[in-house]
């Protein structure tokens, strides 16, 4: 079974004739140099970039033709960063993820149950009453992830989710994404090839808007491909890469 299928997919800038097929579960990372088209591809999958050339379907329907509310119940998107200007609590931010289900001003029992479940999954229950603006980078990222999970999506799309995290929180986040990917599709854009190598079920590498490699981490992240696409020499040591300029 598949969720996203794209054929000859292109955009005004950053993407050219990309064809892909994503399953209903698993952790897929999209890597590549700056300007390779990673965020453009993710934006098309998330329904945020249109019009696009070619075809991109989710669950058999063209992404651009999905009703926004219905699509948001099935596909969750996490941008690189989220800023809150007002003093929302963690729990209030998490409940914002239920917006696609909202039928009025008040939260339902199902909304609260979904938020509780998401905060438990992301280990954010302990600070549910705190002002979101006071959180550390790692805490804030887990809260935003919890908000996305309250949508109870079939696909979770993340644009460089580890960018502002230290190494410990990067590893913790990707372990969690790996667990989530056992039951839903997780697609994450990353610049960190070590995270892609260690945690992905599948890696897609983009170069100049085209797919340069697509397969298991071991198949794709070879020294030859890394040298050609990224312009650096890579050596694998015990499941981790080291680089030379």
Language-model features, listed with the residues they occupy:
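Conserved ABC transporter NBD signature motif
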Residues: 22, 54-64, 71, 130
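Helix-to-loop junction immediately C-terminal to a conserved catalytic motif
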Residues: 46
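Conserved ABC ATPase "signature" region
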Residues: 95, 109-127, 144
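Conserved ABC ATPase signature
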Residues: 131-135, 139
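Catalytic Walker B motif of ABC-type/P-loop ATPase nucleotide-binding domains
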Residues: 156-160
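ABC ATPase nucleotide-binding domains
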Residues: 227-245
